[in-house]
Amino acid sequence: HFDYTFPALLVIVLLFSGLLVSSTTIIEEKSSKAFFRNFITPTSNALFIVGNYLSNLLIVLSQIFIIFLALYIFSEAAVSPDILTNLSIIILLTASVFILLGMLIGYLFKSGETSNLAVMSLACILLFFSNTILPLETLPIAIRSIVAYNPFILAADALKEILLFKAPLAAISFQFYTLLIYIGVFIVLIYVVRLFSKRRYVE
C-alpha cells in the first residue's frame, strides 16, 4: 500500500522541513549582528523576503529530490513523464505554503524556543486534523467543513490524484487555487509583519 501512503509521507516531509527550516532561518537572521545593518540599507523588504524564501525553497526541494532519488534506487520506481509537470507544480506550491507559514512564525516570535514550540504545535495540529491520523468522517460536519481547507489535506489529496490517477490540474483545481490563495495571503502577512517589526525596531 506504499502508493497510497507515499503522498501523505511526502507532505509530512514538506510540512516539518518547510516550517522548521524557514522559521529557524528568520530567527537566526533577527538575532544576528547584521540585522540592524539590513534595516538601514536602502534594500526593500520584498527583496529580503524573496531571498529568504528562495534559499529555504532550495533546501526543501533538495530534500524532496533526495527522497525521490532514494526511492528510485531502492525500489526502481520512476515518476511517469506524463505527471512530472503537475507533480512538480503541486510540490512547489505545497513547499511554498509551509515555507511562507514558517517565515511568518519566525517574524512573529522573538526567540528560537518559542518559534520552535509554535512550529511543532502547528505542525501537529495540521497533521492531527488530516486523514493520516484522524479520519475526517469521524469529525462533526461543521468542523469537517473547516478542516477541509487544511493545507496538509489539500496537498495530500492533490498528490494522490496525480500519482494514482494521473489527474490533470483541471481535476484538482480546488486544491490548486486554494494553495495559491494561501501563498498570496502569507506573502501579504509576512510583508506587513516585517514592516511593522522594522518600524518598532528602529523606534
Model-identified regions with their sequence ranges:
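Transmembrane helix-boundary elements of multi-pass transport/secretion proteins
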Residues: 1-36, 40-65, 69-71, 75-84, ...
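Transmembrane alpha-helical core positions of polytopic small-molecule transporters
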Residues: 12-17, 28, 60, 64, ...
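Transmembrane helix-loop junction
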Residues: 28, 71-72, 103, 107, ...
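Juxtamembrane/transmembrane-helix interface segments of polytopic membrane transporters
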Residues: 63, 67, 71, 106, ...
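The feature captures the transmembrane alpha-helix scaffold of multi-pass secondary transporters
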Residues: 83-88, 141-142
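Hydrophobic alpha-helical transmembrane segments of polytopic membrane proteins
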Residues: 86-112, 127-130, 181-189
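Transmembrane helix segments
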Residues: 109-149
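Short hydrophobic, aromatic-rich alpha-helical segments embedded in or entering the lipid bilayer
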Residues: 134-177
